[in-house]
């Protein structure tokens, strides 16, 4: 699995340990929820501030407010059969607001690392086709997210 992590904000300190955490969570999510995808996939994770994610949220969802994570899947309606042999299949892009990550960690009473892991897992599940439009889907997605995090020592 190829994972590109880009820190495009300067408000929240972002360390190599945080980048490694994102990689471990993304790999674990693929392992537990990516049935049929294999491991030759790629994903990008971009870390932004609230201003940037507000702009993206407005442009793509029509909501002029910050959010914690956005996912842009490459699998939706795409034919990936034309990829050159050996090239990783692009799952898509995850955008995480580190400002939201800090505030939500404080609000929920857990660590920044646990929240960063949660947002990464949540974004990965969306890239792999999971959603939370119904209460049943939301419960299923939350349970899978918690399973991913528990396997990495990030449970509540």
From Swiss-Prot:
Chain sites annotated for binding Zn(2+): 122, 126, 132
The record's free-text note on cofactor binding: Binds 1 zinc ion.
Cofactor: Zn(2+)
InterPro entries: MetalPrtase_cat_dom_sf_prd (IPR023091), YbeY (IPR002036), YbeY_CS (IPR020549)
Similarity-based family: Belongs to the endoribonuclease YbeY family.
Gene: ybeY
Record keywords, A-Z: Cytoplasm, Endonuclease, Hydrolase, Metal-binding, Nuclease, Ribosome biogenesis, rRNA processing, Zinc
Role played: Single strand-specific metallo-endoribonuclease involved in late-stage 70S ribosome quality control and in maturation of the 3' terminus of the 16S rRNA.
Principal subcellular localization: cytoplasm
Pfam families, per the entry: YbeY
Compartment list: Cytoplasm
Top-rank lineage group of the source organism: Bacteria
Record EC number: 3.1.-.-
Listed name of the protein: Endoribonuclease YbeY
């Amino acid at each position: 699995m190829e994972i590109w992590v880009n820190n495009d904000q300067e408000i929240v300190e972002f360390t190599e340990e945080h980048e490694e955490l994102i990689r471990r969570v993304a790999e674990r999510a693929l392992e537990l929820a990516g049935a049929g995808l294999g491991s030759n996939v790629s994903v990008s994770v971009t870390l932004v501030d609230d201003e940037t994610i507000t702009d993206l949220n407005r442009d793509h969802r029509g909501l002029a407010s910050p959010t914690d994570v956005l996912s842009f899947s490459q699998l939706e309606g795409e034919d990936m059969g034309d990829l050159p042999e050996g090239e990783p299949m692009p799952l898509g892009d995850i955008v995480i607001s580190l400002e939201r990550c800090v505030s939500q960690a404080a609000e929920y009473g857990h660590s920044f690392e646990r929240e960063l892991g949660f947002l990464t897992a949540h974004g990965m599940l969306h890239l792999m086709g999971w959603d939370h439009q119904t209460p049943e889907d939301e419960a299923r997605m939350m349970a899978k997210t918690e399973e991913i995090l528990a396997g990495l020592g990030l449970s509540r």
